[in-house]
Curated annotation (Swiss-Prot):
It comes from Rattus norvegicus (Rat). PANTHER family: NESPRIN-4, PTHR21640. The chain crosses the membrane at residues 292-312. The KASH domain, which contains a transmembrane domain, mediates the nuclear envelope targeting and is involved in the binding to SUN1 and SUN2 through recognition of their SUN domains. Residues 53-63 have a biased composition (Basic and acidic residues). Core component of LINC complexes which are composed of inner nuclear membrane SUN domain-containing proteins coupled to outer nuclear membrane KASH domain-containing nesprins. SUN and KASH domain-containing proteins seem to bind each other promiscuously; however, differentially expression of LINC complex constituents can give rise to specific assemblies. Probably part of a SUN1-containing LINC complex. Interacts with kinesins KIF5B and KLC1. Residues 313-340 are perinuclear space. Belongs to the nesprin family. Keywords: Disulfide bond, Membrane, Nucleus, Transmembrane, Transmembrane helix. This is Nesprin-4. InterPro entries: KASH (IPR012315), SYNE4 (IPR030268). PROSITE patterns: KASH. Residues 283-340 form the KASH domain. The gene is Syne4.
Length: 340
């Protein structure tokens, strides 16, 4: 819904001590606003035609307050709200009409403020603000009523479907001894994991196909075959108690499923003696010792080669240094060699 901007937001407010239509002296020093000539053709013609005689708006402030009250707008009547069977399109049409009327009042107020005296602008601005506030309050309440009507219609539709289900069950011969599913027995065929449906984890009461299912009295549990309390009544309270009991039973299954992984975690890993007992102490294969034997033999050959090569390479230098440093006697013959 389009909201038109209010006039005179930048002007200081002044007290209103006179009626809206009363004569006042012209304030020469006050601000003056020239009406914009391009705004008038932009107004809808039907709004201007419907607001040709606005004497009550200028003569009495009380008439303005009565026009802004929520009782004057065409709201949905009380008996229509109680029935809940009226379509929401009619309510939306009435809301649209009320919105157009309120917009027309706002347009008229703006035009009146442009054509009136400068001293009356503040009072007209206050009236327009009050009208806008009433408009917002009214439509906020109307949206709440519309949401309530939609919720009531959904509840009534669900109640009608439940009544139809009960009528169909009453017309039939009734379920067998084990309910509509028969006596519960564990299946011997494996169920694929992607197609498995867990009733314990079903929070919204949906079946395997994702559709809403209704709890049938006397039907066994999908997990353990528990039937719960048998009730002879078919009233709303009996159905509600059966549904709550079934939900509690499924919640107990869900809690037990959640407690199993926690118990496994609490057990913890096996201790060191247990791990030692679990180790296989058989004779290892001879192939595992071959790499170790080969490495030891290679190391031994390297040591032997080093001991053989080091003395051969160090003999000349070692003997030379040893002869140079060792003291020895030198005999010199003066008269020649001794006789032989």
């Amino acid at each position: 819904m389009a909201q038109f901007p209010l006039l005179g937001h930048g002007f200081p407010p002044e007290p209103v001590n006179h009626p809206l239509g009363g004569p006042r002296g012209l304030d020469v020093a006050g601000p003056t606003i020239c009406p914009a000539p391009e705004e008038e053709p932009s107004r809808p013609e039907q709004v201007q035609a419907s607001l040709d005689a606005p004497e009550h708006f200028m003569d009495e402030p009380k008439s303005t307050e009565s026009a802004t009250s929520p009782s004057k707008l065409p709201l949905a009547s009380s008996h229509e709200h109680q029935d809940g069977g009226k379509p929401c399109e009619a309510l939306q049409a009435e809301l649209q009409g009320a919105a157009e009327r309120v917009d027309a009042l706002l347009v008229f107020g703006e035009g009146l403020a442009e054509r009136s005296e400068p001293r009356a602008w503040t009072s007209l601005e206050q009236v327009l603000r009050a009208l806008g506030t009433h408009r917002d309050t009214i439509f906020q309440r109307l949206w709440q009523l519309q949401a309530q009507l939609i919720s009531y219609s959904l509840v009534l539709e669900k109640a009608n479907l439940l009544d139809q289900d009960l009528e169909v069950e009453g017309d039939s011969d009734g379920p067998a001894a084990g309910g509509v599913w028969g006596p519960w027995a564990p299946s011997i065929f494996p169920t694929p994991a992607e197609l498995e449906w867990d009733p314990a984890g079903d929070v919204g009461g949906l079946g395997p196909s994702g559709q809403k299912i209704s709890r049938i009295p006397g039907a066994p549990c999908e997990l353990c075959g528990y039937r719960g309390s048998q009730s002879s009544g078919q009233g709303f309270e009996d159905l509600l108690s059966l549904g709550l009991g079934h939900r509690k039973h499924l919640a107990a299954h869900h809690r037990r499923r959640l407690q199993k992984p926690q118990d496994k975690k609490r057990q913890g890993p096996p201790s060191l003696p247990d791990a030692m007992l679990e180790v296989d102490r058989g004779v290892p294969a001879p192939a595992s010792r071959r790499p170790l034997t080969f490495l030891l033999l290679l190391l031994f050959l390297l040591l032997v080669g080093a001991t053989l090569l080091l003395p051969l390479s160090g003999v000349p230098c070692c003997s030379h240094t040893r002869l140079a440093r060792t003291p020895y006697l030198v005999l010199s013959y003066v008269n020649g060699l001794p006789p032989i």
